[in-house]
Amino acid sequence: MANATVDNKANSEKIKALELAVSTIEKQFGKGSIMRLGANESLVKDVEAISTGALSLDIALGIGGLPKGRICEIYGPESSGKTTLCLSVIAQAQKKGGVVAFVDAEHALDINYARKLGVNTEDLLISQPDTGEQALEITETLVRSGAIDVLVVDSVAALVPRAEIEGDMGDSHVGLQARLMSQALRKLTAAINRSNTLVIFINQIRMKIGVMFGNPETTTGGNALKFYSSVRLDVRRVGAIKNGEDVTGNRTAVKVVKNKMAPPFTKVEFDLMYGEGISEEGDLLDLAVTANMVEKSGAWFSINGERMGQGRDAAKNFLKEHPEYMVELRKKILAANGIGKLLVDTNGNNGEDHEGTEPVEIEAEDAAPKKGKKGKH
């Protein structure tokens, strides 16, 4: 009995000391600077996601797209589809009424191409800064405004420090860009989270000299971006899509190298068509075949007993001409993968449960999605 009394007294003193500490912190730094996690709904709610425009990639990311309030990095070799993927994200955000900004440090954004991908260029905010410091100051101002939903910086490699621009061509500026990025990300991270802005940094690949074993590839701008990013996507061109002798697009592979929202190291492939962007029909067709929602017999494809055509291109054209099948397949795939509530189909209806459908499991080592048990995604 005596021990219980002593314990109660000790607990009471702890609670009083904690209340005093919390009160002191709130007086010094303002109300809300410290709180119990369960008392703040904004900290425990599900992370909002913006679709990438490729359903297979949305599933691979685990939450239905790229997370808002976080930093994401998209990198890869030249002409692999990095900017196209970002423009696709921008188009998806604008469809939901989002405000989007594009910091074009490379001064290479093709407005006509962006329009073809579905971007509303009339409402797109664009900046073409002269220096890396200017680009990151503009980024910080836009993020702190709280009015931006998606902000894309293209690219980290083009964020040239002012000292380098004002110096002579042969001057050495060791680690200047890395220090610039490190300082900027320290300032930006908290503001990005508070404003619930998705900030995407496009990055380029460089080769490390003298690497005998392991991967010699690295990204520009130092290591800070790797640490601060919640999602890192490695985009690669794996082949050409031809119509006879004409090349009409690229087969693109995206690997989720880092993911703080779901299990990483997933890999997907989809078609990037010239002048069109990500082929939604081709992506849906691949997922539907994997999940046995579309039957494939030899070169023939059929859905619900109806012939779609001979060959993948014919099946894609069938889906393009019959949007009702695309809506149906999209809803079934979302429901089967447990993210129907996060992604909305083209008619604005949330995915519903469908019996007899199998979830699509995106495998890390395979180039295409495989059928499997419902698991980590």
Curated annotation (Swiss-Prot):
One of its GO terms (cellular component) is cytosol. InterPro entries: AAA+_ATPase, DNA_recomb/repair_RecA, DNA_recomb/repair_RecA_CS, P-loop_NTPase, RecA-like_C, RecA-like_N, RecA_ATP-bd, RecA_C_sf. Its main location: cytoplasm. This is Protein RecA. It holds the Pfam family RecA_C. GO terms for biological process: DNA recombination; DNA repair; SOS response. It comes from the Bacteria. The keyword Transport does not apply.
